[in-house]
Amino acid sequence: MRRAGAIAAFLILAAATVSVAPQPVLAPLAAPEPAPAKAIPSLGQVHRVFVIVMENLGYRAAMAVPALRSLAERYASASQYYATTHPSLPNYISLTSGGTYGITTDCWYCQLAVPNLGQELSAQGITWGAYMQGLPAACWLGPWWPPGDYAGKHDPFRYYTDIVTSPALCQHIQPLRALRARLAGPPSAVPRFVWITPNLCNDGHDCPAVQAAAWLAGEVAAITASPAWKDGGFLVVTWDEGNGADRRGVDAAGQVVPTGGGGHVLTLVISPLVTPGLVIATPLDHLSLLKTVEEIFNLPKLGATGQASVADFSAFLKPPH
């Protein structure tokens, strides 16, 4: 049984898409950056979180790609991290809401009226941005954009009704190019939570893993060169799901089980606050990543992340001075 099974389902299926009229690329950040209270001292060192989600690659296959193995050896990694389920979309939903809420396909028309990460970050005054490579304009909500190789099923934020029906919240969904200038500026120019979805080639969905790894290495280099990352940055790279035949996952007791999950995937932790080369073997999954973000920013727990059996990423961090 997956952890998501412990959550009540609140799925609303819409019969049509939300309006997809392009809007200007503009997402002003709030000037102040409040320092939230932290319940876990090691996580309290983190000032800014970056998350990159790649596509469809099992752990063993990922570690066989030289560029990915190099990143794992240079930074830190989780050797027992598991996706939620198959196919893609419910993994993205669990990463941002703590459950799958009845979604079992890559439906482009689904809408969810459930608490979610974007909503909670905004409610707490935490700046955030969801950056989608290939997205034609801010708050563009169409299911596909072939010229940019963009797929809406890899943007979880477009599925939450409170985000897509709010002009202010929807403006947090941005083309990836909008992040470039921010990274070149001071830390305050970059949102405190940054989500990055590559296009269908660079995430490895439609192109070879070697090509996706080359893109990822370049993106990691750009982020780690930025003042924002150097100032207590915490970058996590994970894969939405593993090999389709791999059904391993983490159950409600926090143990690895052979069925009910989305497979064994590589997860990288890249931060100046982490010991290089560290490998953590604690069973972790997408709920663990969401729980870690919640604890860093002192957010209410979403879905199943409130369960004590869900481990977080605090073991990756050096003890605070």
Task: Identify what each model region corresponds to.
Residues 25-321:
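N-terminal pro-sequences and low-complexity stem/linker regions of secreted or lumenal proteins
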Residues 2-25:
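Secretory targeting and sorting signals
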Residues 1-3, 121-122:
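N-terminal start-of-domain structural block
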